[in-house]
Amino acid sequence: MFERNQKTIFVLDHTRYFSISSEQYISMDYLKGKPVQETPASGSSSMVVGTQLSKSLWTCAVESSIEYCRIVWDLFPGKKHVRFIVSDTAAHIVNTWSPSTQNMSHVSNAMMMVSVPSRSIPQSSDYSVIHGLRAAIEALAEPTDEQLLATQVGCKQIPNKGRVICITSARDNTSMKSLEDIFNTVLLQQNALVAPPSKKGLQIDHCHLVILNIVPLGVESLVTNRNLLEISPLLDVEIHTVNAPDISDKLLHLIMGHYDLASTTVTNIPMKEEQNANSSANYDVEILHERAAHTRVCGPDFTLTTSIKPGTTYETVTLKWCTPRGCGSSDLQPCVGQYNVTPVDVTSRPSSCLINFLLNGRSVLLEVPRKTGTKTTSHMLSARGGEIFVHSLSIARSAMDEAPSISDGPGGRVSDYRIPELGQLFKMSRMVPLKTKPKGKCSQGEHLWRRLPRYFPRTTNVTILFNLQRQLNWLPHFLHLIVKEDMDKQDEVRCQQQIHELYKSASRGDMLPFNTTNNARPKVGKTKDQYRLFYRELEQLIQLNAQTPHHKNLLESLQSLRAAYGDVSSKLDPGASHLRSYTESPLSPERLEPTSSASNSSSSILKASKRRMSSSGQRSLLDMISIAERSQSNKRLDFSGRLCTPLGQTAKLYPDFGNKEKDILTPGVVTSNLKDESIRS
């Protein structure tokens, strides 16, 4: 309810330095009066030069800060509060948290009375921005009307956060560090004053201090920029050094992050030309509003295109003006939200024309720039009660629409989802809270959650293993044992027997019992491919659940069976590519094509060792090189230090390195030094 942006306080430095020029000159041409003539160096002719004016640093600071609060009060009328404090020899309060002073006219009239600092002010330590920062902390402790109402209702804990924007000019980073330390100290002192039992205000939960270091145009500053930094649990500080003419753009960029705003540029607005009323031209107007106006209209499956305008650092969404036309409510999409809007440049002619057009009771539809032939209307601008709103129209699937069927996939209708099996997986993965906290870093539920869904084909056309559960009576119990985490020796023997029976069926040429519409027996090559895919999917399932040594023994047996069945060669089978397209799972390993026929003896397969699998006929080049290097290294003597070191200790390399006495007594070292001297001579 009470966010950090509910309270914002501007502290304006009113010292002598802010009376100097910003060094950005504006040429003024007068309609009346004699123009100033300037004779060039050649002296042959003269040219008319208009008067050049320049704003002071104080004027730039006041204009930009008032523009900041105008945007806040336009978008959040009566909800967000902004205060101003002017600091010179003391802190001057411009307005309070009262709604009667939270308006543009009150702040503008007060700033006119303050005026620009005088250059005749003597340089003194009494003129400081610290007075204003102290007053800002005291103002944060004062409750707003909403906080007072919450106190009367009976709220015991009222959040109190705020932001302080200090516009000043510091000499270097040391001065900035001193300013931060003083602000943090005063913040702690203020919280100590309002602590019980005094209760002279609200305790400040957190403060965000933004320091804008202002310098004239073309002047180098010794203060470096710094991103948001946590000084203490109560204070975050960020520092920005900007030229005085650019302070408005900087505050516009900051306000979008402070209040979570977004920018929209309305393009192709037809307007009459001032010089020629019979013709019209297209203009663009940039408006600000809450970011939710874009996020709510899009939904999760649609995004609006953004761009960065020249001279800015933030993104803006471009929407095209749609010619107003009469249409009924049935022609419009449902509205999902409305938000206040305000123009970025309120004094420009295009902005003024758009505001007057809307305040006269007209509505404007905004459409997304077309990428296809269809027209998508995403927003609508209208005014009610003197305020302008942007309405977000739903262009994604509405909550009132019927949800699409689960079988309607992106590639068309999918009718073979394994929905019952997925329900069983949910039941197996269901967790309930425990009364006592489990011991250890990883609970049993988290371990189960990580292990169960590692391999689950979503559709029936990508798996052979799970399609045969109804046809093979032993397969469901076999799969249950594979997934079983605490497999014992008896379970391993049962699985070994089933693998043995499966290989015997493959050796006899028995076809797998698929449900087929006709009783035609598949060809021999096709039957082998089915068994080969069955083996591969079964191997992947065992490999993902290999938690015990019994699982690993099963995996080695199955790998031996696959190797003997001929599933290790790169010879291409004519029908294998076609089978792969509809029988292979997406999570299956890389395909291994068959070669020559295997032996029919199942007992020899199960007893085959790894040495037989890696025989000379199947060894790779890397295996042969590794064996040669290993045999060559065995012929060399081991490191003498390792041979002399007792077992369990570490041998030290160069034990006498760095020992000066040892170096002097070593004749080899002396000889080498003499040789070096002779070479140099």
Curated annotation (Swiss-Prot):
It is found in: Nucleus; Cytoplasm; Cytoplasm, Perinuclear region. Keywords: Cell cycle, Cell division, Coiled coil, Cytoplasm, Developmental protein, Differentiation, Meiosis, Mitosis, Nucleus, Phosphoprotein, Spermatogenesis. Residues 574-619 are annotated as: Disordered. The gene is asun. Belongs to the Integrator subunit 13 family. Component of the integrator complex, a multiprotein complex that terminates RNA polymerase II (Pol II) transcription in the promoter-proximal region of genes. The integrator complex provides a quality checkpoint during transcription elongation by driving premature transcription termination of transcripts that are unfavorably configured for transcriptional elongation: the complex terminates transcription by (1) catalyzing dephosphorylation of the C-terminal domain (CTD) of Pol II subunit Polr2A/Rbp1 and Spt5, and (2) degrading the exiting nascent RNA transcript via endonuclease activity. One of its GO terms (cellular component) is cytoplasm. It holds the Pfam family Mat89Bb. Phosphorylated. This is Protein asunder. A motif (Nuclear localization signal (NLS)) lies at residues 606-612. GO terms for biological process: cell division; centrosome localization; dorsal appendage formation; flagellated sperm motility; meiotic cell cycle; oocyte nucleus localization involved in oocyte dorsal/ventral axis specification; posterior mRNA localization involved in anterior/posterior axis specification; regulation of fertilization.
